[in-house]
A protein has these predicted regions:
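C-terminal, active-site-flanking charged/polar segments
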Residues: 241, 351-386, 395, 411-416
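A general secondary-structure signal for short beta-strands and their flanking turns/coil
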Residues: 156, 330, 343, 384-386, ...
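Short amphipathic beta-strand starts and helix->beta connectors
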Residues: 143-147, 371-375, 429
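Conserved catalytic alpha/beta cores of large enzymes that bind or transform nucleotide phosphates
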Residues: 94-100, 118, 247, 262-301, ...
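Short, flexible, solvent-exposed loop/turn segments with mixed acidic/basic and small polar residues
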Residues: 1, 147-153, 378-380, 434-435
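Domain-scale recognition of functional cores that engage charged ligands
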Residues: 3-340, 349-361, 365-366, 455
């Protein structure tokens, strides 16, 4: 596992200021900055406990989760909408329904089509946070964030959401309603685009005997997971791309850390990229000394954490080819949060097929948990991946990298799902920040836990960070 001494940077105050200044300077050029937000996921998992309550034998909130939901119901940003929905679907407001013990009618009004339909909508369109002027969805919080750290020289903010076909129109409608007011509020111009996961990235499902899974005789193809989005990322016209999950947002009053550390990791990225570009120009010129080659090798090993024990056996001419190949790749800087027992992937130093050791984000499904030593290493990791990335996707000559070439095809994995109650094995493509970016130059930077506030269940919205 990578740690502060090994592969994770923890910049001091002086370095921090230098990186923040580097980002501010970069933003004032003509470079294209895009904020990329995967937003196609349905929110159904957020409401798993409430769906269970609807089908339970009992009618009163019984589990801790159910009780917490009803105790805090007035604190949800969707409370007013839900009140109206209850009057429409059940003829009474929330206090009235709760008083007569009809708790299920309240939950039904939240989740079902006749009510707010939250059980079928994507997370990006649900009301998360209350403000004096009305409640905000994650989509709106990402627009606000974009204005705070991703605005270009002319005040233009590019935000790209990946959405599912069925929800695209709802996203567009919300943007049409809100973008102008947000632009005025933050003094920026929004340029908002959408794309969908490409159907040709779907994968075939298998049954438990590894035979093709059939649904009424037809082969079943399923979306291949977030790794499919490397294609969407590849289609963007951008120099720098920020990537962050749709549900990891906080209200404006708590955004300061998020904004500072986003700028910080972007500053680390553009500083490293500048250096790599200078070295590539030097290698191209052919006018370099043996000392300079050694300096570039040190940069690759010490600052980009990419090592190969074989380099000491290479002649200068071979070393130059090796250095050019390694430096001329897409680059990403990923924020890493101290481990507090959250599930999810973590930062590791990993061997690649060409014998180099580099930084990778590995998921538990990529690690053999039956091997006690490997399991312990995974669980003892000091940091985990909150999905907080900044990516540089052009080469030193200004051409776009073809990101598909940098995917490690061998890192796909199998997950277990079901269809109509039947178990199946699903083939997931290499994860977007895992195998899909395996052959990138990767650097990790420690960021505070305050930048990581995901909403995995509806009751997470009752946490102080979301109030």
């Amino acid at each position: 596992a990578a740690s502060i001494e090994k592969g994770i940077l923890a910049p001091d105050a002086e370095e921090k200021n230098a990186y923040l200044a580097a980002w501010d300077a970069y933003k004032n050029t003509d470079k294209i900055i895009v904020k990329f937000v995967p937003a196609s996921g349905a929110a159904s998992r957020m409401f798993k406990n409430l769906f269970e309550f609807l089908s339970a034998e009992y009618d009163k909130p019984t589990t801790k989760f159910e009780q917490a939901f009803f105790d805090g119901i007035r604190d949800f940003a969707f409370f007013d909408d839900l009140n109206v929905a209850c009057q429409r679907t059940a003829g009474k407001d929330i206090p009235g329904l709760m008083e007569e013990g009809n708790y299920k009618a309240v939950v039904a009004a939240l989740l079902e089509t006749a009510g707010l339909n939250y059980g079928a909508l994507p997370k990006g369109l649900l009301k998360f946070h209350k403000y004096p002027e009305g409640s905000r969805t994650p989509l709106e919080e990402h627009l606000a964030e974009g204005a705070m750290y991703a605005a270009g020289k002319s005040g233009k903010v590019n935000v790209h959401f990946t959405v599912s076909t069925e929800h695209r129109e709802l996203f567009k409608k919300l943007v049409e309603e809100k973008a102008e007011a947000f632009g005025k509020r933050y003094g920026v111009d929004y340029y908002i685009t959408f794309s969908e996961q490409k159907p040709n990235t779907d994968t075939i499902a298998a049954d438990m005997d590894n035979q093709p899974f059939r649904d009424n005789g037809k082969l079943l193809f399923r979306p291949g997971g977030h790794g499919a989005l490397i294609e969407n990322l590849n289609d963007l016209d951008a120099d720098i791309i920020f990537i962050k999950n749709i549900d990891n947002v906080v209200p404006d009053k708590l955004k300061a850390d998020t904004v500072t550390y986003k700028k910080l990791i972007a500053g680390v990225l553009v500083s490293l990229q500048k250096k790599a570009f200078e070295y590539l120009e030097l290698l191209d010129s052919g006018k370099y000394t043996h000392e300079q080659i050694m300096e570039i090798l040190q940069f690759l090993q010490k600052q980009l954490f990419c090592k190969n024990p074989e380099t000491k056996n290479l002649e200068d001419a071979e070393l130059v080819i090796y250095l050019k190949n390694k430096l001329n790749r897409p680059m990403r800087v990923c924020g890493m949060v101290k481990n507090v027992g959250e599930p999810g992937g973590g930062p590791f130093l990993a061997y690649n097929s060409d014998g180099t050791i580099s930084l990778q984000i590995l998921e538990s499904s990529q690690i053999d948990m039956n091997d006690p030593a490997k399991k312990e290493m995974f669980e003892k990791g000091t940091h985990f991946n909150p999905v907080d990335l900044v990516c540089a996707v052009r080469d030193y000559k200004g051409h776009k990298f073809d990101l598909v070439k940098y995917v490690d095809k061998a890192t796909g994995f199998i997950s277990y799902k079901s269809k109509n109650g039947k178990d199946l094995k699903a083939l997931e493509l290499p994860g977007l920040w895992n195998g899909a970016m395996s052959d990138w130059n990767t650097v990790f930077v420690e960021v505070p836990l305050t930048t990581f506030n995901p909403v995995k269940t509806v009751n997470d919205l009752l946490r102080e960070q979301h109030q």
